[in-house]
Structure formats: C-alpha cells, structure tokens
Amino acid sequence: MSEAMMWLMARGVWETLMMTFVSGFFGFVLGLPVGVLLYVTRPGQIIANNKIYRTLSGVVNIFRSIPFIILLVWMIPFTRMIVGTSIGLQAAIVPLTVGAAPFIARMVENALLEIPSGLVEAARAMGATPMQIIKKVLLPEALPGLVNAATITLITLVGYSAMGGAVGAGGLGQIGYQYGYIGYNATVMNTVLVLLVILVYLIQLSGDRIVKAVTHK
C-alpha cells in the first residue's frame, strides 16, 4: 500500500470518528429528552399522559423503521438546506443524527424501565417534583444503562457512516467503496474492514469500562 493511500486511510479513520461521535452527541441531545418523556408519560408513571406517549412513540417507531440508506437519500433536500451541501462530512452528520435520535430515545426509555418502581414511589412519597425525580433518581440510577445505550449507538453509527460513504459522505466507507469496490482493490477493502472492526472493538471496550466504573456497588 502506497504512502498516499496510508494517509488517505488515516483521514478516513478521522472522518469516520468525527461522523460517529458528533452525530452521536447530537443524537443524544435530541434522543435523551424524548426517551425521558416517553418514560414519564407512560401509563402509571409520574406524569402519565397517554396521548403524548402514543404520539411520541408513534413518531419514534416511524423513524426507527426507515432503513438508514433510504433515510440518507430522503433527507438530501433537508441536509442541503441545513449545511448547504448533500455530500461530505458535514452533510453526513445531519441524517446520522436523525437516524440515531429515535434509536437512542427508545433505549433511554428501556434503561429507565429497568429502575425499580419502588425508588420512584419513595421519591414521590417524600414530595419530590417530577423534575426532581428525573434529575435525582431516574438519570443517576439509569446511568449504567445510558452508557451502554451510548456504546451501542456509537457502534451502530460506525456502520451507518460506512453506508453513508457509498454516497459521498467520506470516511472509511467511501474509501472502501471507491477504491476497494469500484477500483477492485482487495487490499484496500480488507484494510478498511480491519480498521472498522478495530474502531468497533475500541468503542465497546471503552463503553464496558465506563459502565463498570459507574455501576453502583
């Protein structure tokens, strides 16, 4: 492999990491409050509202059901309106964020559902407000589950970013498609594959260690 290709690979790794972590961050900015709202508005919860819950749940399910490659193409006009282009690193972050947010919201809801109901009831009995329960009970108790959700999301986004590379998003996916598939270069394709596996492994390893650190003894 030439030196130029090695530099291209290094740039691809950087672009993949940027797409993954930036879209993961914005995905959590959108998905975390939606997930919390899904939990607290469920029947029997602290601010139960069946209409809000069904509406939010329906929207989340709709976006979760759309395959990412279709979402990527469908969002081209919106992406172009937001960042001024439909190709490249910045353009990829928009559909990646939209694709990640409903996935995160549902995992946040599931993490909160694992909290023993007795903790919430005890907080309510002591006169805690819904916001206090969310900040002082729900989020701290669900932290290991939320970290695990973040880990799964980032790994999923690595795969999404690789798919986005096939339509000009950049990163390792574009290198693998352009030079490996179109250019019939097995060495490039195998190198991209190995790098993606390493990225996923490192993300999972880091996530497991953080979960262990924040888990209540």
Swiss-Prot record:
InterPro entries per UniProt: AA_ABC_Transporter_Permease, MetI-like, MetI-like_sf
Transmembrane segments: 20-40, 58-78, 81-101, 152-172, 186-206
Cysteine disulfide links: none
Keywords: Amino-acid transport, Cell inner membrane, Cell membrane, Membrane, Transmembrane, Transmembrane helix, Transport
ABC transmembrane type-1 domain location: 13-204
Compartment list: Cell inner membrane
Coiled-coil zones: none
Major subcellular site: membrane
GO cellular component, one term: plasma membrane
SUPFAM superfamilies membership: MetI-like
Biological process according to GO: D-methionine transmembrane transport
Topological relation to the membrane, as annotated: Multi-pass membrane protein
Role according to the record: Part of the binding-protein-dependent transport system for D-methionine and the toxic methionine analog alpha-methyl-methionine. Probably responsible for the translocation of the substrate across the membrane.
Similarity remark: Belongs to the binding-protein-dependent transport system permease family. CysTW subfamily.
PANTHER family for the chain: ABC TRANSPORTER PERMEASE, D-METHIONINE TRANSPORT SYSTEM PERMEASE PROTEIN METI
Name of the protein this chain belongs to: D-methionine transport system permease protein MetI
Species in which this protein is naturally found: Yersinia pestis
